[in-house]
Amino acid sequence: MDGILRKLISIKDLHHCLQKFFVDERESIIEMNDNKLSEQFDLALIETHGKSKILKNLSLFKQTMSNYLTQLSKDNMKETENTVHKIKRVAA
């Protein structure tokens, strides 16, 4: 599946994000070793689009992600590829 995404995605960062929004708070969250704000967020993108648009996109991401995770748990490679592309679009 590495060839599916065009942009590089840190698996550790993706896992942390998914845990942050979809894991029971009692479960542990992977700690990020790198706390540099500029490496966690694209500050130029935030400045370009504005805080309200970024928050709106994050809200949409939270709403759609549980359905996408359900789709990813199925053993259908084509559907998995399509779901990964949907996640990429929502996360952009």
Curated annotation (Swiss-Prot):
It comes from the Bacteria. GO terms for biological process: phosphorelay signal transduction system. SUPFAM superfamilies: Histidine-containing phosphotransfer domain, HPT domain. InterPro entries: HPT_dom_sf. This is Uncharacterized protein HI_1651. It comes from Haemophilus influenzae (strain ATCC 51907 / DSM 11121 / KW20 / Rd).
